[in-house]
Amino acid sequence: MTIKLLAIGKTDNKQLQALIDVYQKRLEFYIKFNLEIIPDIKNVKNLSEAQQKQKEGELILNKLNTTDVLILLDEKGKQHDSIGFSNYLQKHMNSGIKQLVFVIGGPYGFSEDVYNKARGKISLSRMTFSHQMVRLFVIEQLYRGFTILKNEPYHHR
C-alpha cells in the first residue's frame, strides 16, 4: 500500500517544512509515502467560498486514481487516539487497497463532490490548527502509527 497526503498550498514556514521533512523521511522507512502539494488558486478574492471550494475540489479529484481510498481531514471527522489510528491504518493495509489518500482541504473545507467521493473523515482535534501545521501533525501521526504497529519504542503507552 502507498499513502499519499494531498494539501492545498505550499508550506511557507521553513522551520515547519524542516520538521515535515524529518517525519516524512522517518515514515518512508515503513511505507511508500508521497506528499503532494496542490498550488493555491489564483485570484481567490474574486471567488465566493463555494466557488473556491468547487475549484479546489476539482483539483483534488483530478489527483486521484479510480481505486484510491480517499480520507478527508475534517473537523467533523472521527477522532482517534494514536493506538486507534494505528489500528485504522492496519485495517486499510489488510483490505488490499493500493493507495490510501489523506487530504487537507483549503480554508473553507471541501466541495460536495469531494465529500461524496470520500470513504471516511478523520479529525485530529476539536481545536483549529493552521493547515500547514496539520501537515506536520498528520505525517507525525502516520509515523507514530507505524511505530506502534511494529512495537517500536517511539510511542509510550
Language model: regions and residue ranges:
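Short glycine-rich anion-binding loops that position phosphate/pyrophosphate groups of nucleotides
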Residues: 11, 75-78, 106-108
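Structured adenosyl-cofactor binding patch, chiefly the S-adenosyl-L-methionine
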Residues: 112-156
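Conserved RecA-like P-loop NTPase ATPase core
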Residues: 5, 71, 105, 138
